[in-house]
Amino acid sequence: MEIPVSQWCGQGRGLCGHRHCQEEGDQEMKKFVLMFCLWPMLALAEIEHARDLMEENRFEEAMQELWPAARSGNADAEELIGVMYAMGLGVERDDVRAFEWYLRSAMKGHPGAQSGVGWYYEIGRGLPAPDLVRAYTWYVLSAIGGDPDAAISQEEVVKKMTAEQIEKAHELIDDYRVWLFPFR
């Protein structure tokens, strides 16, 4: 005779309703919740350690610290790797890779990376040509995200733009803003 899962008492996961199973299940849940809460702090500690390494000019070690977090989608790590490629810190300077890493981070709402994307579009380095519409777009998004320097960059770029370009940029800003900053 098969015992229904609701009455099963073999794994201590609290499935059967017995007190000892519920207590063991509660302990497992507490461990899970604790790890869930601590995981971001561990990632933050790794990022801060990488920043410290960068300040000590230990760029290769910093890259080793950042790489797993960046590959897992951490926007701070992605932005720092973008900085490293943009400036040739511990890696050969590569504007295309720098832009790609900045863009990954920017699409997750990282204001510093958004300014980096704006700068690359403004200058056109590593890109086929400058694109003032997209430069302005990313500077505005960066300012919305809280980068205090982005407003200055935005003011400089808008001086070089036509009314038509500004209008197109505002269309893009409206498109991105809803997605990147749904509560602002």
Task: Identify the residue ranges that each predicted region occupies.
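Positively charged n-region of N-terminal signal peptides that target proteins for export
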Residues: 25, 29-32
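Short helix-capping/linker turns of helical repeat alpha-solenoids
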Residues: 8, 12, 58, 71-74, ...
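Hydrophobic face of amphipathic alpha-helices that form TPR/SEL1-like repeat modules
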Residues: 47-53, 65, 69, 80-87, ...
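N-terminal signal peptide c-region/cleavage motif recognized by signal peptidases
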Residues: 40-42
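Terminal, low-structured helical/coil segments at or just beyond the last alpha-helical repeat
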Residues: 5, 11-15, 20, 149-184
